Amino acid sequence: MLLEAEFWVAVAFFIFMGIAWKVGAFSAMTKGLDGRANRVRHELDEAKRLREEAAAVLADYKRRRAEAEKEAEAIVAGAREEAERAAEEGHRKLDDFLARRTKAAETKIAQAEAQAEAQVRAAAAEAAVKVSETILRERMQGDAAQNLIRASLGEVRTRMRS
């Protein structure tokens, strides 16, 4: 048993472990492993924090995007309503303008009719006066007849014009 290699390997292993324990190699290895574990834990915490921050930024982006979409929809709806109001106002103004123009045209037509009627009456009165004057001159003679004709014609003209 003392000559077997396994025995001497085991003895060398235990001697090496004893020396390593005496020198403090186990505490150095433990400190190294603990430091590495702390670094990994810190990196995991940092990754978790960054992930939460990214999630918050994403949520904020989604919220802002939704608000912007709502605002854009409100702006479009407002513009659409304003355009409809402007179109209605334009139609109303056009209708008012056409009504005023129609009324003005009707007024001008009525004035033209009244003027034409007055001119026809005046022409008819003038013609009647001339015909009456001609008839009276042919039938009546003398100064008295001329004075009577002038007075009568003046009276006829006055009555026809009024």
Curated annotation (Swiss-Prot):
Predominant cellular place of this UniProt entry's protein: membrane
UniProt keyword Transmembrane, yes or no: yes
Positions in coiled-coil regions: none
Pfam family, one: ATP-synt_B
Keywords: ATP synthesis, Cell inner membrane, Cell membrane, CF(0), Hydrogen ion transport, Ion transport, Membrane, Transmembrane, Transmembrane helix, Transport
InterPro entries membership: ATP_synth_b/b'su_bac/chlpt, ATP_synthase_B_chain
Subcellular localization: Cell inner membrane
Transmembrane segments: 1-21
A single Gene Ontology CC term: plasma membrane
Topology term for the membrane: Single-pass membrane protein
GO molecular function annotation: proton-transporting ATP synthase activity, rotational mechanism; proton-transporting ATPase activity, rotational mechanism
Keyword Transferase annotated: no
Subunit structure, interactors included: F-type ATPases have 2 components, F(1) - the catalytic core - and F(0) - the membrane proton channel. F(1) has five subunits: alpha(3), beta(3), gamma(1), delta(1), epsilon(1). F(0) has three main subunits: a(1), b(2) and c(10-14). The alpha and beta chains form an alternating ring which encloses part of the gamma chain. F(1) is attached to F(0) by a central stalk formed by the gamma and epsilon chains, while a peripheral stalk is formed by the delta and b chains.
The family this protein is said to belong to: Belongs to the ATPase B chain family.
Entry function: F(1)F(0) ATP synthase produces ATP from ADP in the presence of a proton or sodium gradient. F-type ATPases consist of two structural domains, F(1) containing the extramembraneous catalytic core and F(0) containing the membrane proton channel, linked together by a central stalk and a peripheral stalk. During catalysis, ATP synthesis in the catalytic domain of F(1) is coupled via a rotary mechanism of the central stalk subunits to proton translocation.
Protein name: ATP synthase subunit 1
Gene that encodes the chain: atpF1
